[in-house]
Amino acid sequence: MMPTTLFAGTHITMTTVYHITVSQIQLSLLKVTAFQHQNSKKTTKLVVILRIGTQVLKTMSLYMAISPKFTTSLSLHKLLQTLVLKMLHSSSLTSLLKTHRMCKYTQSTALQELLIQQWIQFMMSRRRLLACLCKHKKVSTNLCTHSFRKKQVR
């Protein structure tokens, strides 16, 4: 076999594996969405979504080693965006940190940029919520001033 033929064969095999994996993950996402309606436990939901996300990113990093064009895949970007947004829907700092850990599986700048944008939106929404609560005196002013800082030990 010539090197180009070998590469083409590997490329076709990986493309097939990628499409099968993506279709399985999309099916899993539908199951997760159905699960959300039945069960309101956020932790279980996040664990399921993170497992799916990890599977996507591992597949992605494996494919990127063979084809650098993989990162420009629109369907992949949409899939990753869906995963990130589903995790951020819970509005928890923990899910954001888990998303950040997921980014380490890949060098995708699109995913990194998406995470940064979502992080900024998350922080802004939290600050607005705290400011609103402070106006109605439902939380202490101290909590509003130091909302994202750990209390210093005196």
UniProtKB/Swiss-Prot annotation:
Its main location: host cell. Coiled coil: none annotated. GO terms for cellular component: host cell mitochondrion; host cell nucleolus. It is found in: Host nucleus, Host nucleolus; Host mitochondrion. It comes from the Viruses. Residues 134-154 are annotated as: Nucleolar targeting. Changing residue 121 to P: In strain: Isolate BJ01 and Isolate BJ04. Keywords: Apoptosis, G0/G1 host cell cycle checkpoint dysregulation by virus, Host mitochondrion, Host nucleus, Host-virus interaction, Modulation of host cell apoptosis by virus, Modulation of host cell cycle by virus. GO terms for biological process: regulation of cytokine production; symbiont-mediated perturbation of host apoptosis; symbiont-mediated perturbation of host cell cycle G0/G1 transition checkpoint; symbiont-mediated perturbation of host cell cycle progression. It holds the Pfam family SARS_3b. A motif (Bipartite nuclear localization signal) lies at residues 135-153. Induces host cell G0/G1 arrest and apoptosis. This is ORF3b protein. It comes from Severe acute respiratory syndrome coronavirus (SARS-CoV). The lineage of its organism: Viruses, Riboviria, Orthornavirae, Pisuviricota, Pisoniviricetes.
